[in-house]
Design a protein with these regions (language model features):
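Short, acidic/polar
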Residues: 187-198
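Hydrophobic faces of well-ordered beta-strands that scaffold small-molecule active sites
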Residues: 172, 207, 255-257
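Short proline/glycine-enriched turn/loop motifs at strand-loop junctions of beta-rich domains
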Residues: 67-73
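The feature marks proteins involved in alpha-glucan
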Residues: 1-61, 84-85, 90-173, 178-183, ...
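Conserved, mostly hydrophobic/aromatic
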Residues: 174, 209, 248
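Conserved small/polar residues in nucleotide/adenosyl-binding loops
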Residues: 259-266
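Aromatic-lined carbohydrate-binding/catalytic grooves of carbohydrate-active enzymes
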Residues: 198-242
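The substrate-binding groove and active-site-proximal loops of carbohydrate-active enzymes
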Residues: 175-189, 224-236
């Protein structure tokens, strides 16, 4: 017999929907148990997976990791190997569905495009890595690919710590691409230079940036997210976004953003 949630007990109007509410609640608990390995780690640990997964520069070169428990083979393909499957770019399967490859420093370079060729029982396909931090769209084919983002002189935040004034918190909702007067897609730099000063002048201390993660359909206002860890390349580079956030903090303005995922295979994560 299912246990009645206090939420339903406290609100009789919810009784007709008790089954659906209880089912959804249990689904959340089951998913949390899966993501936290039954409580052996926290949701914060899971959310920090980008520090471990994805492409990272190391003292010896590069390390790339992906979680793909149902895969049988995975190759990294890109402009660095003419998009061909090479033994040198084949990932090795580790424990718990993790795949990994270590590459020398000259194997890939800043600006290279790449994807994963993933094989599974009965199928195969190209996929953008789940933890890609930079994804760009080809102007001709309109196809999205991950991009290596490792500039020689990456942007360094000038304001190391920041705590906004929340008494009260005055939030200005904005969209980077639609904030300009011109009929075009605005940029991070334009927003920083032209819009932020006006927001500060009006007395706001927080900007809620409408979904800023990479999304294939611009008309979704950014809410068809395909890559959680990649800021939209339509508006500029990761470093230009950092400069925008830095400038906001200098003006006493906090920055928040929220969104949800898009269900699609070829331009989304694994």
């Amino acid at each position: 017999m299912e246990k009645t949630l206090n939420l339903v007990k406290n609100d009789p109007w919810l009784e007709p929907f008790a089954g659906a509410i209880t089912g959804r609640h249990q689904h959340v608990l089951d998913k949390e148990a899966e993501l936290t390995n039954k409580g052996k780690q926290t949701l914060s640990d899971f959310a920090s997976g980008y520090l471990y997964f994805g492409l990272h520069r190391t003292d010896k070169g590069w390390t790339f990791r992906e979680w793909a428990p149902n895969a049988t083979h995975i190759y990294m393909v890109g402009t660095f190997n003419n998009w061909e499957e090479k033994a040198a770019y084949k990932l090795k399967k580790q424990k718990n569905g993790i795949w990994e490859i270590n590459l020398p420093a000259d194997a890939i370079h800043h600006g290279d495009l790449y994807k994963l060729n993933v094989y599974w029982e009965g199928g195969q396909g190209e996929r953008i890595p789940a933890w890609a931090t930079r994804v760009v769209q080809d102007e001709q084919t309109k196809i999205f690919s991950a991009q290596v983002w490792a500039p020689e002189n990456p942007y360094k935040f000038k304001k190391k710590t920041f705590k906004p004034d929340t008494n009260p918190l005055l939030i200005y909702e904005c969209h980077i691409g639609m904030a300009q007067q011109e009929e075009k897609v605005g940029t991070y730099n334009e927003f920083r230079e032209k819009i932020l000063p006006r927001i500060a002048e009006e007395g706001y201390n927080c900007i809620q940036i409408m979904a800023i993660q990479e999304h294939p359909y611009y008309g979704s206002f950014g809410y068809h997210v395909s890559s959680f860890f990649a800021a939209s390349s339509r508006f500029g580079t990761p470093d230009e976004l950092k400069a925008l956030i830095d400038a906001a903090h200098e003006m006493g303005i906090a920055a928040v953003s929220y969104t949800h995922l898009r269900a699609h295979e070829t331009d989304s994560y694994l």
